């Protein structure tokens, strides 16, 4: 059984037991969270697609860790004008483990 959930403005295909890095969620490590924005649930031959959400469907997950992603380097330059600008960015993330998918 798998589901498509929306969190942090992005959509993820999840199954029970998977670990997944999502946008930062303000929750403590080893705490349970409930993802209620479930867009689709499928198991075997049965597929339920929401309009836009599947009514009553939830995904329960456990927060494993918090961290920061790889550095993205930004470099701007104007040719012949001796203008150069460097910038870097590291996005915060939360790693979660999917425990249960329920309808």
Curated annotation (Swiss-Prot):
GO cellular component: cytoplasm; ribonucleoprotein complex; ribosome
Keywords: Ribonucleoprotein, Ribosomal protein, RNA-binding, rRNA-binding
Organism domain of life: Bacteria
GO molecular function: rRNA binding; structural constituent of ribosome
Subunit structure, interactors included: Part of the 50S ribosomal subunit. Contacts protein L20.
Free-text function comment from the UniProt entry: This protein binds to 23S rRNA in the presence of protein L20.
Protein's name in the database: Large ribosomal subunit protein bL21
The species this protein was found in: Laribacter hongkongensis (strain HLHK9)
